């Protein structure tokens, strides 16, 4: 006989429920929660128990009157004879017991199997009931089937002490849709690859910025905080998935039989035991929400910092850095803590991984506010960039180059400001379906998971200052390695007085037994050491009026604002306005 297979989403739905002492009404929410599903199941059970009492009482009277039992169709018309071995669906349950008799015998008694309320079954007939609409993930156009044998008992699975039932049509919506399964597999692969690449690239970027001391400045400190928030967001997603779905794979869920589903749905665990069992997953979900919020707020900090550099005449970077740090890490902790308190007090059920009514807005409203504010800052900065480009190219005829620069600057700022969040911000994914839903999910999974990778590439690996430091470090390392290699091979270096050259492998010094006959053109030119001293004049040269020449020379100090250098960025001029070259490194990155 057939064996019912339960879909993954329903198994996960019923695997972690905790029934509270007092049921609340099902929230008019955009997400169907586990608690709401359990409430509907128990309400259906209560209605079924009431109906069973009435039907059993009527059936007992019929059997006592020796009128027997005959099945009736859902429309009240006589049912046609059916070919054996075929399933014939009915649109609703039989609620009235007919008095007409074509076939005598004891009927199969109605019962509640923790999923469906089964009606009386006629001997030798297949009973079909619609897939219940109170189970959210069922295919509500299908039917579930049972067979009543000629002895008045529900047919059992051979070799198993359980009732046979066929829920295949109810589960067809989830298990037999290969195309939908491929979509979910593809989405999972996209965000797994994206977050893995982001985590790896951001780790390298943070190590680079932390290793080179010349890169230590306010601008790069803020970059490092944002990189760290992306890393923690990716890591928390992987941890959350591992904790929530560690004991339940999709293949295992699909192998669950109808009997196992009944056991899952029967009695929820006690609240005390459930609280201990859910502690790990609740902590994982809480940290995931916190790091998600901090990531949004550090993206906002980047926008506020760049906006402040442009529009604030007096800007103390060191003082603002502390404020930005508290804002980026502290403010999300406040509203996440409020959400945890409300959830633990009013909706302390399950793993907290699904929304519970309108309590989700405690976290979503601050995040949406940061996205909107950052988008406003983005528009204002793009306006300033366009104005700067027009002023720079005033009097020139090549406007296409101007537009290309503006487009490039805009694309560079898009991942930094998280502009892609605004595309579907006003369209919740639960309100769309079909092709639009697939487009939205692929778009969000792609950009959200790869955003950290794009940010690391643009603001670290493609940064001219970072590349210069890496090249200098590489040159020093190769020179030191070359010097050690030559020292081990026995080579020595020739010297010109106190100076040593590391580029020669020939000993030119007057050492006995080791001198080589060299051409005069290959020998170093003889130099007069006095000619290198200050105040020395060649014989016959005109005398210098001022014979006092300073030993030290004044060299203009590099303020550090040019060429993207960090040196000097954090040196404030007391009481003076911010120097104009302060934006040079930002413009070079953006332009």
Curated annotation (Swiss-Prot):
Glycans are attached at residues 151, 161, 166, 176. Gene3D superfamilies: GPCR, family 2, extracellular hormone receptor domain, Rhodopsin 7-helix transmembrane proteins. Residues 27-188, 240-282, 343-361, 429-440 are extracellular. N-glycosylated. It comes from the Eukaryota. One of its GO terms (molecular function) is protein homodimerization activity. Residues 67-104 are annotated as: Disordered. A motif (Important for interaction with G proteins) lies at residues 474-477. Its main location: membrane. Keywords: Cell membrane, Disulfide bond, G-protein coupled receptor, Glycoprotein, Membrane, Receptor, Signal, Transducer, Transmembrane, Transmembrane helix. SUPFAM superfamilies: Family A G protein-coupled receptor-like (SSF81321), Hormone receptor domain (SSF111418). The chain crosses the membrane at residues 189-212, 220-239, 283-306, 321-342, 362-382, 410-428, 441-463. The keyword Cell wall biogenesis/degradation does not apply. Residues 81-96 have a biased composition (Basic and acidic residues). It is found in: Cell membrane. Detected in kidney. One of its GO terms (biological process) is osteoblast development. Disulfide bonds join 48-117, 108-148, 131-170. Residues 1-26 form the signal peptide. It holds the Pfam family HRM. InterPro entries: GPCR_2, GPCR_2-like_7TM, GPCR_2_extracell_dom_sf, GPCR_2_extracellular_dom, GPCR_2_parathyroid_rcpt, GPCR_2_secretin-like, GPCR_2_secretin-like_CS. It is a multi-pass membrane protein. Belongs to the G-protein coupled receptor 2 family. Homodimer in the absence of bound ligand. Peptide hormone binding leads to dissociation of the homodimer. This is Parathyroid hormone/parathyroid hormone-related peptide receptor. It comes from Mus musculus (Mouse).
């Amino acid at each position: 006989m057939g064996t019912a297979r339960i879909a993954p989403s329903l198994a996960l739905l019923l695997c972690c429920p905790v029934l509270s002492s007092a049921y609340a009404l099902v929230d008019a929410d955009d997400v169907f929660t586990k608690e709401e599903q359990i409430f509907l199941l128990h309400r259906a059970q209560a209605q079924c128990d009431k109906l069973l009492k009435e039907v059993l009482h009527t059936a007992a009277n019929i059997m006592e009157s020796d009128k027997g039992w005959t099945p009736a169709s859902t429309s009240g018309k006589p049912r046609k004879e059916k070919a054996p071995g075929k399933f014939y669906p009915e649109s609703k349950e039989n609620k009235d017991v007919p008095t007409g008799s074509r076939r005598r015998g004891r009927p199969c008694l109605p019962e509640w199997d923790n999923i469906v309320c089964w009606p009386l079954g006629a001997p030798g007939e297949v009973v079909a009931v619609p897939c219940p609409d109170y189970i959210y993930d069922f295919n509500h156009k299908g039917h579930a089937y049972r067979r009543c044998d000629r002895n008045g008992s529900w047919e059992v699975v051979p070799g198993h002490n359980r009732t046979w039932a066929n829920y295949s049509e109810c589960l067809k919506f989830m298990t037999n849709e290969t195309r939908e399964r491929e979509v979910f597999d593809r989405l999972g692969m996209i965000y797994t690859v994206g977050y893995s690449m982001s985590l790896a690239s951001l780790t390298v970027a943070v190590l680079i910025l932390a290793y080179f001391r010349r890169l230590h400045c306010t601008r790069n400190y803020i970059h490092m905080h944002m990189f760290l928030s992306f890393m923690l967001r990716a890591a928390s997603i992987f941890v959350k998935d591992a904790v929530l779905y560690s004991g339940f794979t999709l293949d295992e869920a699909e192998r669950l039989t109808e009997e196992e589903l009944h056991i899952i749905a029967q009695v929820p665990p006690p609240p005390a035991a459930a609280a201990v069992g859910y502690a790990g997953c609740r902590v994982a979900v809480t940290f995931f929400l916190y790091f998600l919020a901090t990531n949004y707020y550090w993206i906002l900090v980047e926008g506020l910092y760049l906006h402040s550099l442009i529009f604030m005449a007096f800007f103390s970077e060191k003082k603002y850095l502390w404020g930005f740090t508290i804002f980026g890490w502290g403010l999300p902790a406040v509203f996440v803590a409020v959400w945890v308190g409300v959830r633990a007090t009013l909706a302390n059920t399950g793993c907290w991984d699904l929304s519970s009514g309108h309590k989700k807005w405690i976290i979503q409203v601050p995040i949406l506010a940061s996205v909107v504010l950052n988008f406003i800052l983005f528009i204002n900065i793009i306006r300033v960039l366009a104005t700067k480009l027009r002023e720079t190219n005033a009097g020139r005829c090549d406007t296409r180059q101007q537009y290309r620069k503006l487009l490039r600057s805009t694309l560079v700022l898009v991942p930094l400001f998280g502009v892609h969040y605004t595309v579907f911000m006003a369209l919740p994914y639960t309100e769309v379906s079909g092709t639009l839903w697939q487009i939205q999910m692929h778009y969000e999974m792609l950009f959200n998971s790869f955003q950290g990778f794009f940010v690391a590439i643009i603001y670290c690996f493609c940064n001219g200052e970072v590349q210069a430091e890496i090249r200098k470090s590489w040159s020093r390392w190769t020179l030191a390695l070359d010097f050690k290699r030559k020292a081990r091979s026995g080579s020595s270096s020739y010297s010109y007085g106190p100076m040593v050259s590391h580029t020669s492998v020939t000993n030119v010094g007057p050492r006995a037994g080791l001198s080589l006959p060299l051409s005069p053109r290959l020998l170093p030119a003889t130099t007069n050491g006095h000619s290198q001293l200050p105040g020395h004049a060649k014989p016959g040269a005109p005398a210098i009026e001022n014979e006092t020449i300073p030993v030290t020379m004044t060299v203009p100090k590099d303020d550090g604002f040019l060429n993207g250098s960090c040196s000097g960025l954090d040196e404030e001029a007391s009481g003076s306005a911010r120097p104009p070259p302060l934006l040079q490194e930002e413009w070079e990155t953006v332009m």
